[in-house]
């Protein structure tokens, strides 16, 4: 689960297995809306205050992927690190 409060992701960095689809559960505990976004993957999810939802990431190659809260781009950053087995 990833909690977003006042434009800050907790945790703000997660590791996932490369080559597998991954479900991320998002919980917006902030007073306003959240727009979870990654342009490269064409992922965009808007959550109202107090809402809970999820996104499914595609099979990722090993590497780092950045997601933002479009409404709070300076503080709202989440780094997803896809690791191959044994890394």
PLM regions: where:
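N-terminal edge beta-strand
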Residues: 1-21
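Short beta-strand/loop motifs in extracellular/secreted proteins, especially
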Residues: 22, 32-34, 76
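Asparagine-centered strand-capping/turn motif at beta-strand->loop junctions
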Residues: 26-28
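Extracellular/periplasmic metallocenter environments
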Residues: 1, 47-87
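Beta-strand-rich interaction surfaces with strong enrichment in secreted/lumenal proteins
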Residues: 12-14, 42-46
């Amino acid at each position: 689960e990833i909690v977003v409060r006042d434009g800050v992701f907790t945790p703000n960095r997660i590791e996932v297995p490369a080559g597998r689809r991954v479900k991320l559960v998002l919980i917006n505990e902030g007073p306003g809306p959240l727009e979870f976004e990654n342009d490269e993957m064409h992922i965009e999810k808007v959550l109202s205050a107090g809402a809970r939802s999820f996104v499914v990431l595609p099979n990722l190659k090993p590497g780092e992927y950045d997601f933002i809260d479009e409404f709070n781009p300076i503080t709202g950053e989440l780094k997803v690190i896809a690791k191959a087995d044994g890394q």
